[in-house]
Amino acid sequence: MQPTFYVRAKWDEEAGVWYTAETSIRGLVTEAETLEKLRERLMLIIPDFLEEQMPERAVLHILAESADELIREAAE
């Protein structure tokens, strides 16, 4: 079975970026303008970040979290 790395990504409304809020890889921090760009960045930097500790193959599991305010329009 392949090892799995977990990343919880959150949306920062003020900065306009997705960032790594929690991860199973200690010290891994990054951000990107879109969730897809964050995924691409993680796929590139994780092997370099882990160096010799990186297994030959692994699974990257990203849980994305964002919150939006819902406003009910007044009935006419």
Spans of features found by a protein language model:
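Short aromatic-glycine-(Arg/Gly/Cys) micro-motifs in beta-strand/loop hairpins
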Residues: 10-25
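Short, charged, surface-exposed hinge/linker loops at domain edges
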Residues: 1-8, 14-15, 36-76
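A short, exposed loop/beta-hairpin motif centered on an aromatic-Gly-Thr core
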Residues: 26-37
